[in-house]
Amino acid sequence: MSTTNQRPGVTPREVAPRSIDRGVDIGHVHLKTADLERIKQFYVDILGFDVVFRMPDALFIAAGGYHHTLGFNTWESKGGTPPPPGTTGLYHVAIRYPTRATLGDALRRLVRADYSLSGVNDHGTHEALYLNDPDGNGLELCWDRPQSEWPLDAEGHLAFGNRRLDLAGLMAEGAPSEEVDSAGHWQPAHRA
């Protein structure tokens, strides 16, 4: 038996009859795209991911030296349209940032590019920005609070919340000092 099954965490509300090893995680997500250049402009030029491999009909991007965090291809979807509402499929992919300051940087990048958010939330466990990529794929850009700060009920189960996110504070978090006014609000030096 692996010792990773003993890693601390929240108490599950339902335990699988034969639980998977707790060290298992999602390695990457591979998505269909209608237009590789358009998707590259968003993920690389705006969000700042690095291109690690490219083929005429596929693009692989990553952060932090990983082989690829996200893959995109036009094998079955070149020029295609997103699935219509009311169909099953991907709701969103969460891209987790290591610090609140790096999530603030992502928010500032989106603002500079005039890219719209569909929602923001403080879930107690993490702060989240919601948006759709150019192909309509749902994204959650998020930063996890330390696990010791996650809200739990009396039985140790997660108690997710939907609190108002301090967007102004997040915008200013980690911003260069010359871009933060005396009230602590981010004032962009320029827009892209």
PLM region descriptions:
Residues 21-23, 31-76, 192:
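Core segments of cupin and vicinal oxygen chelate
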Residues 31-37, 94-150, 158-180, 185-192:
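Vicinal oxygen chelate
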Residues 50-57, 142-152:
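Conserved catalytic-core motifs of GNAT/GCN5-like acyltransferases
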Residues 10-20:
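A detector for short, charged/polar N-terminal pre-domain segments
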Residues 2-12:
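Eukaryotic nuclear low-complexity, Arg/Ser/Gly/Pro-rich intrinsically disordered regions
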Residues 19-23, 84-88:
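Short, flexible turn/loop "capping" segments at secondary-structure junctions
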Residues 26, 56, 90, 126:
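Short coil/loop residues immediately preceding or within conserved phosphate-binding loops
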Residues 67-71, 80, 135-140:
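Short, charged/polar, Gly/Pro-enriched secondary-structure boundary elements
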